Regions:
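Short linear sequence motif anchored by a di-proline
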Residues: 1-242
Length: 242
C-alpha cells in the first residue's frame, strides 16, 4: 500500500527521481506498477517497476503473478533469484502492507479471509518518516518473440520468518531495512548482502484489522486501511501465502 508520492520517496531516501508519478494505491495487486529504489552505479534513484518478477530467461510474462515474493532463506539458491543478488538489489518503499488469516465469526456461515494492515511504528528505527523499506530484487525482461518490444522492469519482495507480533497473523513477513540496512542493501560493493539482514523487533510495526473490502483488488480507497473492530474472531488456519 502506498500513499506517499514518488517525489516524497525520493526526498525521504535521498535519491534521484527516475520516473513519472505513479497513482497512489491503497490496494496493490500482483503485476501492479510500484516504486523501487535501485543503485545502478550513479547513486540511488527511484523508478517504476511491475510487481512480480519475470526472469530474464522467461519466454513470456506468465510467471510474473506467481513471483511476487521470495524467501530470503533460499533466495541465493533459486535460479530465478540467485544471479540477481550481486547487482540487482532494490528497496521497495511502502506505507504498509496487508496480511490475512482465516477466521470463524459468529456473524458468518463459513470461515472468512480476515485482512490485517501492518504499518511502521513512528518511533521505530524501521520507520523512514512513516514509510517502510522492504528488501527486493529487480530485473529487466524483453520479449524474445518481439524484438521491438519495450524492456519490462520487474521486482520481487523478500520475506523472512515473522517475528512474534506478526506471527499472530501470518508466519512470514517482509524483510524490513533500517537506514543503514538500506545503504548496505543498495551498495554494489557489498559482496554478502544477506549477512547484514537483521531480525526485526516486535515494536517495528503496528497492526489493525481492516475491512474485507481489500480482498477485492477492484476496491482502492483510504477506507481500506481504516481500523475495524472484529466480532469475536476465532482463527481457523493460517493461510500459506509465501
Amino acid at each position: 500500500m502506498r500513499k506517499t508520492t514518488a517525489l516524497e520517496i525520493a526526498d525521504i531516501f535521498s535519491c534521484s527521481l527516475d520516473t513519472a508519478e505513479l497513482p497512489i494505491s491503497f490496494n496493490v495487486a500482483p503485476t501492479s506498477r510500484v516504486l523501487g529504489i535501485v543503485n545502478s552505479g550513479g547513486g540511488p534513484s527511484v523508478g517504476a517497476f511491475s510487481w512480480g518478477l519475470i526472469p530474464r530467461w522467461a519466454p513470456d510474462t506468465s510467471r510474473a503473478a506467481s513471483l511476487i515474493n521470495a524467501r530470503i532463506e533460499t533466495v541465493g539458491e533459486k535460479p530465478s533469484f540467485r544471479d540477481l543478488l550481486a547487482q540487482h538489489r532494490c528497496v521497495l518503499p511502502m506505507d504498509g502492507y496487508f496480511e490475512w488469516n482465516e477466521q470463524l465469526r459468529h456473524d458468518a456461515m463459513k470461515p472468512i479471509k480476515q485482512p490485517y494492515y501492518f504499518s511502521a511504528d513512528s518511533q521505530s528505527g524501521y520507520s523512514h518518516r512513516g514509510v517502510l523499506a522492504v528488501a527486493g530484487l529487480w530485473t529487466a525482461w524483453k520479449d524474445p518473440n518481439q524484438p521491438n518490444s519495450p524492456v519490462v522492469h520487474t521486482v520481487v519482495a523478500l520475506t523472512t520468518d515473522a517475528n512474534d507480533m506478526v506471527s499472530k497473523v501470518h508466519h512470514r513477513m517482509p524483510v524490513l531495512l533500517d537506514p543503514s540496512g538500506v545503504s548496505l542493501w543498495l551498495d554494489q560493493n557489498n559482496v554478502d548482502p544477506l549477512a547484514h539482514i537483521q531480525v526485526v523487533d516486535n515494536e517495528a510495526l503496528v497492526v489493525c484489522a481492516v475491512s474485507t473490502k481489500v480482498n477485492n483488488s477492484r476496491n482502492n480507497g483510504s477506507e481500506l486501511i481504516e481500523p475495524i473492530m472484529l466480532t469475536q474472531p476465532q482463527p481457523v488456519e493460517e493461510l500459506k501465502l509465501f
